[in-house]
């Protein structure tokens, strides 16, 4: 009986410890489908780790299968008026056209951020939502660092937060103290970590250029800040970035270039990894038709799949017809041009089980848009890639794919059936690409902890320690001239020039004195 009581007491104590450790965490997802997928996965990981999770979700038409999701945690949905959604759809379409035809896109990108700034103002004006979030008294907020509005939400709530970066960490070199530009390529530069002299010149100039563009982007939220924060306590977005307790980066060094990281930076690329399931029988039957030749998987992302032009579809379809492999292609059947006959070795579907197909033993190649989630899945399964990057982080991801010899990238503007077919055949037949993909797979799998375990472990760490002040370098508080030792350089330069000037003056005086003395002696 006594033993039973002791066991009962220990059970209650253990339950109490679990309840004490469970934190109330808010996650914020207000961007497009790929961002939504990652933040939803993060929310699920935190929930499964014993935390009470609430997700603030922007219910957008851009999020596929939204209504199919049945999360086990609380979700707060909000949606802007229909005319606002139409405005964003028009802006997105314009941006896509500019990218497709190689025109400048920065001004349209500014308009998109201006739209997001207006959208943010609407959300901050939703008293019902903001009051609910305040009353919940969350212990921590996890946000997408690309969603600048979420920084303002957190500032309104006055809560600690951790930031999830869905891109390469190089994107934050414009908001955080940057790694040396001599070997850390700037986001958007198209460079690798091995730069010659002119590469370093380009990298430096790109850093200056994008820094100015980043300021323009941040300025699109100025009116929202002025409207919702009282004068004298209006936050600066670039300063809010530095407040993050932790930075989770959706990448892995199996893909990314090695670089120094801050102690509060954790790479968790591969969060979307999940157990492989058998593929549907109709897909298995299609693949088996091609025997040892195998198949090619084509998936160009949720947004890109909706905007593929007739010309692009025609060229790709013609290229696939030249392959001995079968081709499984994620392409909306409603978008397929009526006057284009589907190649006999191609099967198109609105949706495909991408993870399960990448793990299939008969896969030979993955044709991708180069989105981080898709690239990490390919690395996880050791599948070579051909990338057709469209925008944002996709070109940068493909630079890394090429540098690691995991595949090649082709430009959308120059995509032609013949050259596209030759490129795919080259990657399939040249065993060096498959070998490099398998080597990256080994690196990716050799971590002692899974991405989910790393994320959960570090979240628990800062909850237990009351924050991550012990992990933040003083560089976050330093003015840029101190951080880059410019003041020391100028001081030493001034000291050197002063010493040189004084030495010249003394030398001139001594020379003049000796000259006069010589003349006196001669007289």
Curated annotation (Swiss-Prot):
It is an enzyme of class 2 (transferase). Residues 23-487 are extracellular. Glycans are attached at residue 52. The chain crosses the membrane at residues 488-508. Highly expressed in kidney, while it is expressed at low levels in liver. Not detected in other tissues examined. Keywords: Glycoprotein, Glycosyltransferase, Membrane, Signal, Transferase, Transmembrane, Transmembrane helix. One of its GO terms (cellular component) is membrane. Residues 509-523 are cytoplasmic. It is a single-pass type I membrane protein. It is found in: Membrane. Its main location: membrane. It catalyses: glucuronate acceptor + UDP-alpha-D-glucuronate = acceptor beta-D-glucuronoside + UDP + H(+). GO terms for molecular function: glucuronosyltransferase activity; UDP-glycosyltransferase activity. Its EC number is 2.4.1.17. GO terms for biological process: cellular response to genistein. Residues 1-22 form the signal peptide. Gene3D superfamilies: Glycogen Phosphorylase B. It comes from the Eukaryota. InterPro entries: UDP-glycosyltransferase (IPR050271), UDP_glucos_trans (IPR002213), UDP_glycos_trans_CS (IPR035595). UDP-glucuronosyltransferases catalyze phase II biotransformation reactions in which lipophilic substrates are conjugated with glucuronic acid to increase water solubility and enhance excretion. They are of major importance in the conjugation and subsequent elimination of potentially toxic xenobiotics and endogenous compounds. Belongs to the UDP-glycosyltransferase family. This is UDP-glucuronosyltransferase 3A2. It comes from Mus musculus (Mouse).
């Amino acid at each position: 009986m006594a033993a039973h009581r002791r066991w009962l007491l220990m059970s209650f104590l253990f339950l109490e410890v679990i309840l004490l450790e469970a934190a109330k965490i808010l996650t914020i997802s207000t961007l497009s489908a790929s961002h939504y997928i990652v933040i939803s996965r993060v929310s699920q990981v935190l929930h499964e780790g014993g935390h009470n999770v609430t997700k603030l979700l922007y219910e957008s038409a851009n999020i596929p299968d939204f209504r199919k999701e049945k999360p086990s945690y609380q979700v707060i949905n909000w949606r802007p008026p229909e005319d606002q959604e139409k405005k964003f759809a028009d802006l997105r379409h314009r941006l896509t056209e500019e990218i497709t035809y190689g025109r400048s896109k920065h001004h349209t990108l500014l308009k998109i951020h201006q739209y997001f700034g207006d959208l943010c103002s609407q959300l901050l004006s939703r008293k019902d939502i903001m009051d609910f979030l305040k009353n919940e008294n969350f212990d921590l907020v996890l946000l997408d660092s690309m969603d600048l509005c979420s920084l303002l939400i957190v500032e309104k709530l006055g809560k600690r937060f951790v930031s999830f970066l869905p891109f390469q960490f190089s994107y934050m070199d414009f908001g955080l103290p940057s790694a040396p530009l001599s070997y850390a390529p700037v986001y958007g530069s198209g460079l690798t970590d091995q730069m010659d002299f002119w590469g370093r010149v380009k990298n430096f100039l790109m850093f200056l250029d994008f820094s100015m563009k980043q300021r323009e982007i941040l300025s699109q939220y100025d009116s929202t800040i002025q409207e919702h924060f009282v004068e004298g306590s209006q936050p600066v977005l670039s300063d809010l970035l530095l407040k993050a307790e932790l930075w989770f980066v959706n990448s892995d060094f199996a893909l990314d270039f090695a670089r120094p990281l801050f102690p509060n930076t954790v790479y968790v690329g591969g969060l979307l990894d999940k157990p492989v399931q058998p593929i549907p029988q109709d897909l298995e039957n299609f693949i088996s038709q091609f025997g040892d030749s195998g198949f090619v998987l084509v998936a160009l992302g949720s947004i890109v799949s909706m905007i593929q032009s007739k010309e692009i579809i025609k060229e790709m379809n013609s290229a696939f017809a030249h392959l001995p492999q079968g081709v499984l292609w994620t392409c909306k059947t409603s978008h397929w041009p009526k006057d284009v006959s589907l190649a006999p070795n191609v099967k198109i579907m609105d949706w495909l089980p991408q993870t399960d197909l990448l793990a299939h033993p008969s896969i030979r190649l993955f044709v991708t848009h180069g989105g981080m989630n898709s690239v990490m899945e390919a690395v996880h399964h050791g599948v070579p890639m051909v990338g057709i990057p469209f925008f944002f982080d996709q070109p940068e991801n493909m630079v890394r794919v090429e540098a690691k010899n995991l595949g090649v990238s082709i430009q959308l503007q120059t995509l032609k059936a013949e050259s596209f077919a030759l490129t795919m055949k080259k990657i399939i037949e040249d065993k060096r690409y498959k070998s490099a993909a398998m080597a990256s797979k080994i690196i990716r799998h050799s971590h002692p902890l899974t991405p989910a375990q790393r994320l959960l472990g570090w979240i628990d760490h800062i909850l237990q320690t009351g924050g991550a002040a012990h992990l933040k370098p003083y560089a976050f508080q330093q003015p840029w001239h101190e951080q880059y030792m410019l003041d020391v350089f100028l001081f030493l330069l001034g000291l050197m020039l002063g010493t040189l000037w004084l030495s010249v003056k003394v030398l001139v005086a001594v020379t003049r004195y000796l000259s006069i003395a010589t003349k006196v002696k001669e007289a």
